Amino acid sequence: MAPPTRENPKVLLVEDNEMNRDMLARRLRKIGYEVEIAVNGQEGVIKATQDRPDIVLMDMSLPVMDGWEATRNLKANPDTQQIPVIALTAHAMASDREKAMAAGCDEYDTKPIDWSRLMGKVDALINQPPQSLS
């Protein structure tokens, strides 16, 4: 996998499963990403608001606040609405993708994670020009 084109892009990984979290964080760091971790949706919203990552990888089945609600919160906040969010979920039905997009996710990927597919989505979202809100 090629390194990111931006220098040290910051990823917020919101994942409660320790094994998934450690594997993804390790692989992201290995190729040059700075990784911040949150273990539930509420913590993810707080960290995204404080740290302003370049992208959020959001598990949808989270304790305290699920990924759907966390994404809606991020997209409703003018300070975080431009941060791309990729939904990570074990649910692979077409209706699940539609639910993710309706919540405000910019992309959707299923578990188990296909590393190349996920990184293609991450790279595309990080390297797209910012959208104007006007």
Where are these regions (language model features)?
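Active-site beta3 strand of CheY-like receiver
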Residues: 51-57, 62
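C-terminal output helix
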Residues: 25, 112-122
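The feature encodes the CheY-like receiver
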Residues: 63, 81, 93, 111
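Short hydrophobic/Thr-rich beta-strand motif most characteristic of the beta2 strand and flanking loop
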Residues: 32-39, 47
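Conserved acidic carboxylate
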Residues: 15
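Charged docking surfaces used in two-component/phosphorelay signaling
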Residues: 22-30
